[in-house]
């Protein structure tokens, strides 16, 4: 159930170049039951910046009423958010959207989780949920360069974790697909979140696999009212059929929407 709440900053730190880990506390956490959902953050008081920022939920601790989100500080809004200190309040709307279907993976199966850049964070909560139900997890994390790699060790605690960097400064040189090819990775179900180029590459390979992708889109309202984040359906690529990433997604079965 979506709610709005002023949540307390428990901790915030930079964990890689311009990548921040923000932990917030509040009873809203009790509504966060679906990995892959996101929250809409009002980054500052007043009207500037006007629009909220959508940020994925990385980790949920309902016993402490705390959740963690990771984000890249690159624009005015996220740079403002990066200045928030312990004890301050943050206006949070959420949880929003439809997340990853954990129930589609069965105990004893192997799930491949592929993340690219700031698409990596929502896979962490997903991985924990899968491990808890007896699913073997393999992670492939793609980044541009070593300076922006994060959470490699945390994912490795849950299952095999491979890193690819475009410039080869850490892990396998190249893209996430190069890791799959190099290690001959096989799996029963795929979950992925990241840039469109990466998602397209995975879709081209695994149309016949059970697979789910999470889209990263700029959003206005976050609740399906403004139509700023619509995407066409593959069965009607130039027609009037569409899905809204914020409310129908951000997670879709592979092959459903036009990437």
UniProtKB/Swiss-Prot annotation:
Q: What does this protein do?
A: Responsible for channeling the electrons from the oxidation of dihydroorotate from the FMN redox center in the PyrD type B subunit to the ultimate electron acceptor NAD(+).
The free-text cofactor remark is:
Binds 1 [2Fe-2S] cluster per subunit.
Q: What is this protein called?
A: Dihydroorotate dehydrogenase B (NAD(+)), electron transfer subunit
The record's annotation in PANTHER family points to: DIHYDROOROTATE DEHYDROGENASE B (NAD(+)), ELECTRON TRANSFER SUBUNIT, DIHYDROOROTATE DEHYDROGENASE B (NAD(+)), ELECTRON TRANSFER SUBUNIT-RELATED
User: Keywords of this protein's UniProt record, alphabetized?
Assistant: 2Fe-2S, Electron transport, FAD, Flavoprotein, Iron, Iron-sulfur, Metal-binding, Pyrimidine biosynthesis, Transport
| CDD domains recorded | DHOD_e_trans
Pfam families this protein is in? DHODB_Fe-S_bind, NAD_binding_1
The record's note on quaternary structure and interaction partners says:
Heterotetramer of 2 PyrK and 2 PyrD type B subunits.
Q: Which InterPro entries match?
A: Cyt_c3_hydrogenase_gsu (IPR012165), Dihydroorotate_DH_ele_sf (IPR037117), Dihydroorotate_DH_Fe-S-bd (IPR019480), Dihydroorotate_DHASE_ETsu (IPR023455), FAD-bd_FR_type (IPR017927), FNR_nucleotide-bd (IPR039261), OxRdtase_FAD/NAD-bd (IPR001433), PyrK_electron_transfer (IPR050353)
Cofactor list: [2Fe-2S] cluster; FAD
GO biological process annotations for this chain's record?
'de novo' UMP biosynthetic process
The residues that hold [2Fe-2S] cluster are 221, 226, 229, 246
**One MF annotation (Gene Ontology) recorded for this entry:** oxidoreductase activity
List the PROSITE patterns hit by this protein, alphabetically: FAD_FR (PS51384)
The residues the record assigns to binding FAD are 53-56, 70-72, 77-78
UniProt similarity note? Belongs to the PyrK family.
Q: Which organism is it from?
A: Bacillus thuringiensis (strain Al Hakam)
Q: Which residues form the FAD-binding FR-type domain?
A: 2-102
Q: In which pathway does it act?
A: Pyrimidine metabolism; UMP biosynthesis via de novo pathway; orotate from (S)-dihydroorotate (NAD(+) route): step 1/1
């Amino acid at each position: 159930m979506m709610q709005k709440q002023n949540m307390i900053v428990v901790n915030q730190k930079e964990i890689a170049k311009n990548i921040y880990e923000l932990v917030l506390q509040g009873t809203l956490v009790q509504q966060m039951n679906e990995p892959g959902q996101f929250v809409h953050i009002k980054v500052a008081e007043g009207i500037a910046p006007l629009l909220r920022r959508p940020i994925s939920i990385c980790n949920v601790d309902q016993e402490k009423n705390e959740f963690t989100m990771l984000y890249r500080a690159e624009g005015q809004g996220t740079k403002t958010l990066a200045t928030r200190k312990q004890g301050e309040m943050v206006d949070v709307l959420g949880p929003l959207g439809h997340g990853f279907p954990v129930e589609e993976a069965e105990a004893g199966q192997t799930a491949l989780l592929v993340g690219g850049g700031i698409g990596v964070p929502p896979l962490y909560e997903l991985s924990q949920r899968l491990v808890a139900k007896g699913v073997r997890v393999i992670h492939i994390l793609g980044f541009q360069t070593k300076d922006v790699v994060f959470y490699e060790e945390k994912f490795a605690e849950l299952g095999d974790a491979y890193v690819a960097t475009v410039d080869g400064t850490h892990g396998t040189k190249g893209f996430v697909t190069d890791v799959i090819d190099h290690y001959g990775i096989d799996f029963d179900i795929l979950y992925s979140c990241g840039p469109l180029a990466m998602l397209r590459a995975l879709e081209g390979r695994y149309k016949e696999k059970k697979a789910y992708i999470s889209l990263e889109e700029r959003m206005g309202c976050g609740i399906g009212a403004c139509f700023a984040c619509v995407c066409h359906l593959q069965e009607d690529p130039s027609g009037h059929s569409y899905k809204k990433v914020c409310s129908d997604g951000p997670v879709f079965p592979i092959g459903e929407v036009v990437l």
